[in-house]
From Swiss-Prot:
The 26S proteasome consists of a 20S proteasome core and two 19S regulatory subunits. The 20S proteasome core is composed of 28 subunits that are arranged in four stacked rings, resulting in a barrel-shaped structure. The two end rings are each formed by seven alpha subunits, and the two central rings are each formed by seven beta subunits. The catalytic chamber with the active sites is on the inside of the barrel. It comes from the Eukaryota. It is found in: Cytoplasm; Nucleus. Residues 1-33 are annotated as: Disordered. Gene3D superfamilies: 1.10.8.60, Nucleic acid-binding proteins, P-loop containing nucleotide triphosphate hydrolases. Acts as a regulatory subunit of the 26S proteasome which degrades poly-ubiquitinated proteins in the cytoplasm and in the nucleus. It is essential for the regulated turnover of proteins and for the removal of misfolded proteins. The proteasome is a multicatalytic proteinase complex that is characterized by its ability to cleave peptides with Arg, Phe, Tyr, Leu, and Glu adjacent to the leaving group at neutral or slightly basic pH. InterPro entries: 26S_Proteasome_ATPase, AAA+_ATPase, AAA_lid_3, ATPase_AAA_core, ATPase_AAA_CS, NA-bd_OB-fold, P-loop_NTPase, Prot_ATP_ID_OB_2nd. The keyword Cell division does not apply. This is 26S proteasome regulatory subunit 4 homolog. ATP binds at G210, L211, P212, G213, T214, G215, K216, T217. Pfam families: AAA, AAA_lid_3, Prot_ATP_ID_OB_C. Coiled coil: none annotated. One of its GO terms (molecular function) is ATP hydrolysis activity.
Length: 424
């Protein structure tokens, strides 16, 4: 009996252990499975429906984003087409002289004629001002546009983008002239407070006069090199234009550009081309030259003496200039350039021969003590010609014979030009 009882107890324990093991395995499998969502089919259908709806919405968004630029471009293109029709083509260019009211003005064309015209409503009124360049309809000359930031092409050419390479060291002698132009042009631009403390006004401009080849243009180039100011160079003949009113307009444009790029220096070479003495004449061309000079006088009187604009003029014939042009208040300082003396000639020869290989036979003193009058340009021409003679004979050194031959050739050409001028 006892044996049967022990066997039953062992069987019950084994059964209990097996049940526990099965329960543990079943619980482990249930924990590893994902939770089930009921009803499963309904949730899947809803998920697919929402996914399809999101795809359709993104597709619609892409289509709308592609259509909006087309609509805006179509609208802008149609507006541009209407504006172009109103403007007309091709467009002419004129100058706005004055306003009559908000919708009308007076303009001048390239031939000098004045017109009372309409100003279109689509033109930017903030850009319109007397003297600006405007676009005109080719049929009725109405103002249809404004050229912004324009600069006359001729004035743009006059403006030197790169400073000249000449310096004061390249000028032989002329110490007095250099000092005067420094006091008149360079010092007022670099140290204007000195004149204010002294209680005086600096000169508006200077005029350089003297014989040809004495260094007037060279000194002006040296001033442009020494200062960081904008340098505008113009020859007097460039201010003489074919059509009526173009010369004075070019003078106004020249001073306007100088004011825009201040501090600036205006160098007018050969001023006698437009600054000659006035007299009664029936010639239309001569009257136009006189009008150009009157505009130059007006500009010299107009700008303030303490602003950053200086004027340098140069001429060979100061006696031919109109007294109103060179009177004090307009051109306050007159600097004369004479023929160089022996010491100055020696300095000029040393400057031009400093980079040349000279033979031992070269004696500059013999060239200086000659009876002929030598200007700075003549000395430079002699040195250049002597170097070319040496090159012609395949030599690297320049001899005294080369200088003598060069001097004879230069003076022969000079005398020939003088003789031709007497009988022309």
């Amino acid at each position: 009996m006892s044996r049967d009882k022990s066997e039953r107890d062992n069987l019950q324990d084994t059964t209990t252990i097996n049940l526990r093991r099965r329960r543990r395995v079943k619980e482990g499998k249930a924990a590893s499975k994902p939770p089930q969502v009921y009803p499963l089919m309904k949730c899947k259908l809803r998920y697919l429906k929402l996914k399809k709806l999101a795809h359709l919405l993104s597709l619609e968004d892409n289509i709308l984003s592609l259509c909006e630029p087309d609509k805006s471009s179509e609208g802008s293109n149609s507006q541009k087409h209407v504006v172009e029709q109103l403007r007309g083509s091709p467009l002419s260019v004129g100058t706005l002289e004055e306003f009559v009211d908000d919708h009308h003005g007076i303009i001048t064309t390239g031939v000098g004629l004045e017109y009372y015209v309409n100003i279109m409503s689509f033109v930017d009124k903030d850009l319109l001002e007397p003297g600006c360049t405007v676009l005109l309809n080719y049929k009725d000359n109405s103002v249809v546009g404004v050229l912004e930031g324009e600069m006359d092409p001729m004035v743009n050419v006059m403006k030197l983008e790169k400073a000249p390479s000449e310096t004061y060291a390249d000028i032989g002698g002329l110490e007095e002239q250099i000092q005067e132009i420094k006091e008149s042009v360079e010092l007022p631009l670099t140290n204007p407070e000195l004149y204010q403390e002294m209680g005086i006004k600096p000169p508006k401009g200077v005029i350089l006069y003297g014989l040809p080849g004495t260094g007037k243009t060279l000194l002006a180039k040296a001033v442009a090199n020494q200062t960081s100011a904008t340098f505008l160079r113009v020859v007097g003949t460039e201010l003489i234009q074919e059509y009526l009113g173009e010369g004075p307009k070019l003078v106004r444009e020249l001073f306007r550009v100088a004011d825009m790029h201040a501090p600036s220096i205006i160098f007018i070479d050969e001023i006698d081309a437009i600054g000659g003495k006035r007299y009664n004449t029936s010639s239309g061309g001569r009257r136009e030259v006189q009008r150009t000079m009157l505009e130059l006088l007006n500009q010299l009187d107009g700008f303030d003496t303490r602003n950053d604009i200086k004027v340098i003029m140069a001429t060979n014939k100061i006696e031919a200039l109109d007294p109103a042009l060179i009177r004090p208040g307009r051109i306050d300082r007159k600097i004369e350039f004479g023929m160089p003396d022996a010491a100055t000639k020696k300095k000029i020869f040393d400057i031009h021969t400093s980079r040349m290989t000279l033979d031992e036979s070269v004696n500059i003193e013999l060239l200086i003590t000659s009876k002929e009058d030598l200007s700075g340009a003549d000395i430079k021409a002699i040195c250049t010609e002597a170097g070319m003679i040496a090159l012609r004979e395949r030599r690297k050194t320049v001899t005294m014979k080369d200088f003598i031959s060069a001097r004879e050739k230069v003076f022969f050409s000079k005398q020939k030009m003088v003789s031709a001028g007497l009988y022309s």
